[in-house]
């Protein structure tokens, strides 16, 4: 760790976790007995270590059809959603409750967090309460001034891969300011071929200095190609599994027997790239059998166990993918975050992980996968 003073250490009921606010390094012990680490991973934290805070209630990018144009089925239904953004006062209430308990806020919701009317104030509130903010953006409204704010306050920023000039422009603006920049790439049946093209090209050419896209002309020319290049200098590409939620369709879901997906997993398992490769926890059931992936790097669904989502109108959900039906919602106008976290509603959600697939050797690594959209679980075993 570069700066020990930036490392926050939290002692929970029977384990210890630590987070470095500068590097993003996270570590937790196994369950502790008599001061010794048993090696058994704790099931949950006593308070969410990460909160996905939905500060956006509507989306300019989605409203004008740009998500659909890029072939992305927005799980927040940004095409139709027209709710107000979270108020600054509500955000302050959240941050105050999380001070000293939560390491990170993932700013999100239905829209680009950098377009919130109080974006700078929100970042300042995070800093005042010792919480590191991160967020994902389409990049549609990214500016140099916003990129500077990101450098000043954020741990990292992810740009969704929308295959457009503004995608690359946003990435390059962030990189120019020294922001740790990731790409979020939605992995679906219709994007698998393109994902394979990216990885094969970058694996073969990872020592070649690729285009820097210094002008709008370069951007437009690049965007006319079948598959854009990931800009040089990005920290990681994080693959997010497509879910049939909101505008996402079941027809575009990946299945475990998809040959392109199996080839994709082989490539990730066998090769190295000029950037890190990551996945959301929804993909873990498909990753646990990869022999060159360190099992310690895999963490299955953390919803309701380590993290939670807060809607723009202040409902706590175990995961943002419950944003449409809100089956496991708890109203924060009536309960504190701590009370909602310990509620029967959240316990019902967690029971899925405790009781799923009890006889499977991978139970502790997978826990049965997603309780919200079980059809996305990429496992060839039925328990």
Model feature map: region roles:
Residues 59, 63-74, 351-383:
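Cysteine-cluster motifs in flexible loop/terminal segments that predominantly coordinate metals
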Residues 257-291, 315-367:
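C-terminal accessory region of radical SAM enzymes
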Residues 290-299:
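Short, basic/aromatic recognition patches
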Residues 301-304:
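Short, small/polar residue-rich loop motifs at catalytic or cofactor-binding pockets
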Residues 310-311:
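Short, acidic, Ser/Thr-enriched surface-loop or helix-capping motifs
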């Amino acid at each position: 760790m570069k700066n020990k003073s930036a490392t926050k250490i939290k002692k929970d009921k029977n384990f210890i976790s630590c987070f470095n606010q500068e590097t993003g390094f996270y570590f937790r012990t196994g369950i502790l007995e008599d001061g010794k680490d048993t090696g058994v991973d704790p099931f949950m934290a006593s308070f969410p270590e990460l909160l996905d805070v939905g500060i956006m209630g509507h989306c300019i990018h989605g409203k004008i059809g740009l998500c659909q144009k890029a072939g992305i089925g927005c799980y927040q239904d940004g095409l139709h959603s027209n709710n107000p953004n979270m108020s600054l006062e509500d955000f302050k209430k959240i941050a105050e409750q999380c001070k000293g308990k939560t390491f990170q806020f993932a700013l999100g919701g239905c829209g680009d967090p950098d377009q919130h009317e109080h974006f700078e104030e929100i970042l300042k509130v995070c800093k005042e309460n010792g919480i590191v903010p991160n967020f994902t953006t389409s990049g549609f409204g990214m500016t140099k001034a916003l990129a500077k704010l990101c450098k000043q306050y954020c741990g990292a920023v992810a740009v969704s891969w929308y295959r457009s000039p503004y995608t690359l422009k946003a990435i390059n603006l962030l990189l120019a300011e020294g922001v740790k920049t990731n790409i979020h790439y939605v992995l679906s049946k219709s994007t698998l071929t393109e994902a394979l093209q990216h990885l094969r090209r970058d694996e073969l050419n990872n020592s070649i200095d690729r285009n820097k896209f210094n002008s709008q002309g370069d951007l437009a020319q690049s965007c006319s190609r079948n598959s854009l290049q990931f800009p040089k200098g990005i920290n990681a590409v994080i693959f997010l599994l497509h879910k049939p939620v909101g505008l996402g369709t079941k027809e575009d879901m990946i299945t475990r027997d998809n040959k392109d997906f199996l080839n994709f997993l082989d490539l990730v398992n066998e090769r190295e790239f000029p950037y890190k490769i990551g996945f959301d926890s929804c993909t873990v059931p498909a990753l646990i059998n990869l022999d060159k992936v360190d099992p310690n790097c895999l963490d299955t669904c953390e919803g309701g166990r380590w993290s939670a989502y807060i809607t723009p109108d202040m409902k706590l959900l175990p995961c943002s993918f419950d944003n449409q039906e809100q089956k496991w919602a708890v109203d924060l106008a009536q309960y504190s975050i701590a009370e909602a976290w310990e509620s029967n509603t959240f316990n019902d959600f967690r029971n899925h992980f405790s009781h799923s697939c009890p006889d499977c050797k991978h139970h502790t690594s997978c826990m049965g996968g997603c309780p919200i959209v079980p059809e996305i679980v990429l496992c060839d075993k039925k328990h």
